[in-house]
């Protein structure tokens, strides 16, 4: 189940598993309480593709787009928009790549990217190292050697998150969690496209990544914000 908050005059973007975008206005969807209606009645979804995500924002809003293949780029909301029922190709991906939900960017200059692979490698780098594109594959986010991309259990990019300046990065592995504050994050910080650093052995199988905001006190010391008071995740 996926939902978004929007206004009746705002466009809604639907992204499918093949990286295509489709557009509808929210007022064209049923407003009464019901099970809804099939999107295929309005949009020509490509064969063998399924709708994965919904977006709605102002035209000049920026997003981080990427896939499990380890590539990504920055894109404006207006570049997802299309008037054609067949949609348009936005993200180019290999056959087995999985599309990540695009992440809304608040500060292109200050925000960072946190990338975690399926083998427990973490790389943090400045968001502005990625290009602005209207469509395409993007640039390499994290390096995964070709030999690691083969076999029964190939290494892929598993999590891709926007990491604001004053936030903890919390790595979950089952019942265990590793909290990296802004100071500790430096150990995993590098340049875009590098290999990243392996997490401690207990956290190699990452099951969830959480962004935890800090509240800066008068003495300049950061304090973790109660999750109930935060909308970041």
Predicted segments — roles?
Residues 1-233:
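Short, structured "edge-of-domain" segments at secondary-structure transitions
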């Amino acid at each position: 189940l996926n939902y978004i908050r929007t206004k009746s005059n705002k466009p809604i973007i639907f992204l499918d598993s093949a990286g295509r975008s489709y557009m509808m206005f929210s007022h064209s969807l049923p407003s009464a309480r019901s099970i809804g209606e099939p999107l295929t009645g309005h949009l020509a979804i490509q064969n063998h593709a399924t709708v994965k995500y919904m977006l709605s924002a102002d035209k000049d809003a920026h997003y981080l787009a990427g896939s499990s293949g380890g590539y990504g780029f920055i894109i404006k909301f207006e570049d997802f928009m299309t008037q054609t029922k067949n949609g348009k190709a936005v993200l180019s991906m290999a056959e087995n790549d999985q599309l990540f939900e695009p992440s809304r960017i608040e500060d292109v200059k200050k925000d960072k990217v946190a990338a975690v692979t399926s083998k427990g490698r973490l790389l943090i780098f400045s968001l502005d190292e990625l290009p602005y594109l209207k469509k395409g594959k993007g640039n390499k986010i994290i390096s995964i050697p070709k030999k690691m991309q083969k076999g029964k259990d190939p290494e892929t990019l598993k999590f891709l998150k926007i990491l604001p300046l004053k936030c903890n990065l919390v790595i979950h592995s089952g019942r265990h969690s590793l909290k990296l504050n802004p100071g500790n994050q430096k150990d995993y910080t590098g340049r875009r496209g590098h290999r990243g650093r392996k997490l401690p052995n207990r956290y190699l199988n990452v099951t969830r990544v959480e962004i935890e905001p800090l509240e800066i006190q008068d003495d300049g010391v950061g304090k973790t914000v109660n999750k109930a008071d935060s909308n970041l995740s």
